[in-house]
Amino acid sequence: MSRGPRNVQATDRAIASALGRMSVLVLLYHGVRPDDAQPATTNLQAKHVSQSAFAAQMDWLIGAGYRFIDGDELRWMSKARSLPRGPAVAITFDDGYANNHSCALPVLRPREIPALVFLVGAFVDRGEPLWVDRLEQAVMSARVPELTVDLNGARRTLTLAGAPARKAAESSVRSYCKRLPATARESVLQELFAGLDAPSSPLPALYRPLRWDEIDDLRHAGWTIGSHTMTHTILAGLTAAQARREVGEAKALLEARLGDQCDLFAYPNGLRGDFTEETQRVLAGLGKTCALASVEGRVTRRFEPLAMRRVAVHDRMGLAEFKVRTTGAVGVAKSVKAGLRTAQSALRRRRAG
């Protein structure tokens, strides 16, 4: 006999309660899109979830007994090095897409759910499209069958024959460009754009940044505003001075425009290797009290305030997978695999020596 909805919800609440005694869940979103079909050339990385899926996820969290925490509680966690009463969850958005206001807010406001959004300074202030979105759109709308470009010091020819090949080409260029400082990255992109012969049309509305009046509306709805650097450049590849400028300029911009201290931060990309101890010293020197990474997992009792884990949510994730990921099991599995690889490498080195 299958379990009824009440029994399922009771189980969900029991699991959430048990996890909440020793950890906090921080969810990472980028955008929320309308439910109507999107063009095949957009949302390749599935970082904009459908509005109906987002609503279902929020309703499941409510039904499982989660308490939604805001920026003030994250600050308290960082300063006290302690966890709030659980089960607790924070809803976070990176980059600053306009659909955070047009699609996410209508889901969160009636449910009285607070959120945090981490803004890329140049994106929201100057309306400069994020380079990853410019790349995605240019590759997917290119009018040439292939492209030769310098990647990692070598000339590579990328085929663009069909959607799968275009997605693979976009992924290769994106992975390479992520490791470059902003100026070098822009040089690579300009060479690539010149050879793609893509239409010079505006980017789809999905990629539009928040306006300042929309940001103010989010604040009035209980959202906390944090920074995500000035140009979305991975900090580990920068000198301390460059990192200080990337973080400091965005912090100064947001504080000047919003009139509040901007002490919360999210790392661009945010995976292991994308930030270092030196990066964390730069953040601390600029008054950052809490920094969120993209390393998968829940925030446990021994967390680092300047490297708090999150669980990323994407558009291809069904509710069943969402439930599993909220437990942090995927992050644990990844950590175990990484540990095994490290141990195996060490063993091979000892044998070779």
Predicted regions and their residues:
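CE4/NodB-like, metal-dependent polysaccharide N-deacetylase domain
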Residues: 27, 60, 84-85, 97, ...
